[in-house]
Design a protein with these regions (language model features):
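ABC-type nucleotide-binding domain
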Residues: 1-205
Length: 205
């Protein structure tokens, strides 16, 4: 968590090895990520970003992007888990509906992206939480899908609203490119530092 421009995206880029650290190291299961190939590292992550995309093709093509041999049964099961089946089955041709960039809403794109990740079930997740640009009902569906997806997985959440990370086991508070505080929600509130100010300013506004 942290204000705009604090380094949250840079942190994720380092985690995914889009570029490497200049000093220090990032360890996953005790191993320096620079000792692992970029392909192997990235394939162990599932990503759901708020500015997600759909490729030109069918709904099925978009969901099976990371698992091209998936059966319809597996796809439908993942879609139900990800709360996207409700809108998919209403599309003119269901899974065979051809999508373009503006065929579905931003929230529906995010639900599709969650379905894609749900189908592959990677060991780690990077989630950029839903924004206020989606309607409340879809936002609740996205949050439910996130909760389902995170069970039993190491998850990194880029949070814009602090209410969504109250149950996180560890919160990293960033400012000006540095981690300035860390702890769980209760610990950080008790410290009365930057997180405390950030949290209360969101609820006051």
């Amino acid at each position: 968590v942290g204000p705009t421009g604090c380094g949250k995206t840079t942190f994720i880029n380092l985690l995914m090895r889009f570029y490497d650290v200049d000093e220090g190291k990032i360890l996953v299961d005790g191993k320096d990520i620079r000792e692992v190939s970029r392909h192997a590292l990235r394939s162990s992550f599932g990503m759901v970003l708020q500015d997600t995309w759909v490729k030109s093709g069918t709904v099925r093509d978009n969901i099976c992007f990371g698992k091209p041999d998936a059966t319809d049964e597996e796809i439908i099961c993942a879609a139900k888990e990800a709360r996207s089946w409700e809108f998919i089955r209403r599309l003119p041709k269901g899974l065979d509906t051809v999508l373009h960039e503006d065929s579905i809403s931003q929230g529906q794109k995010q639900l599709l992206c969650i379905t894609r990740v749900m189908l592959c079930l990677p060991p780690m997740l990077i989630l950029d939480e839903a924004t206020s640009s989606i309607d409340t009902r879809t936002e609740l569906q996205v949050q439910e899908a996130f909760d389902k997806l995170m069970k039993g997985r190491t998850s990194f959440i880029v949070a814009h609203r602090l209410s969504t990370i109250r149950n996180a086991s560890l919160i990293l508070v960033m400012k000006d490119g540095k981690i300035i505080e860390q702890g769980n929600h209760e610990e950080l509130l008790k410290k009365g530092g930057f997180y405390h100010k950030l949290y209360h300013s969101q609820f006051e506004s």
